[in-house]
Design a protein with these regions (language model features):
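N-terminal domain-start signal
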Residues: 1-86, 121, 158
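Periodically patterned hydrophobic/aromatic "hotspot" residues that form packing/interaction faces
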Residues: 5-9, 48-52, 87-90, 128-133, ...
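Hydrophobic core segments within long, regular secondary-structure runs in both alpha-
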Residues: 22-30, 62-70, 100-114, 143-151
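Residue-level detector of solvent-exposed, low-hydrophobicity positions
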Residues: 43, 68, 82-84, 89, ...
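A contiguous, surface-oriented mixed alpha/beta subdomain in the mid-to-C-terminal portion of proteins
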Residues: 96-100, 109-174
Length: 174
């Protein structure tokens, strides 16, 4: 029984320490994040947890996300709404060379999707574009793959629209 109590104590102590570290990291992240950002809310807390798991400094990570968001203007990528900060956070988990290579790919991927679905493709597709862009595939290939998934999902009985496009984008990642 003593060993079991010691083990339980270690688990509880470690959980308490982790919870305190997570809360302190959330506070540091939110202090470095503009109040109007998507990252200022609960979504930012999820990003903090992932950053913490990778031993990232939360305040430095928030600054990196903002710096990457700033690059979106240079590449004429969508900068307003819910998804641009999420796309920047996704990219922030990657190296500088990967981010640099991903930005023009994101633009090309969005253009490929817009060619197939001009009324559906918006800034809301930016996170999915970032997820595909860091993988390094050519935009034409990504466009074809997503469109194939879109048509297959539609033929299986799903309704056309933004939700189907998002499902196709995510399905094409696997």
């Amino acid at each position: 029984p003593t060993l079991a109590l010691q083990s339980l104590s270690l688990i509880i102590d470690d959980a308490d320490r982790r919870a305190a570290l997570l809360r302190a990291s959330e506070i540091a992240f939110h202090q470095a994040t503009p109040w109007w950002s998507t990252m200022a809310g609960p979504l930012g807390d999820a990003v903090v947890a992932r950053a913490l798991a990778r031993s990232e400094d939360p305040a430095a990570f928030a600054q990196r996300v903002r710096a990457i968001e700033g690059l979106f203007k240079q590449w004429r990528l969508p900068r307003f709404g819910f998804m641009p900060p999420m796309a920047a956070a996704w990219l922030a988990f990657h190296s500088d060379p990967e981010v640099t290579a991903a930005l023009p790919r994101m633009k090309a991927i969005l253009a490929a999707w817009k060619k197939d679905h001009p009324w559906l493709t918006t800034g809301d597709d930016l996170l999915a574009a970032a997820m595909h862009a860091v993988r390094g595939a050519h935009s034409d290939r990504v466009g074809r793959l997503v469109e194939d998934r879109y048509q297959a999902l539609h033929q299986s009985g799903l309704w056309r629209g933004q939700s189907l496009q998002r499902a196709a984008q995510l399905a094409a990642l696997h």
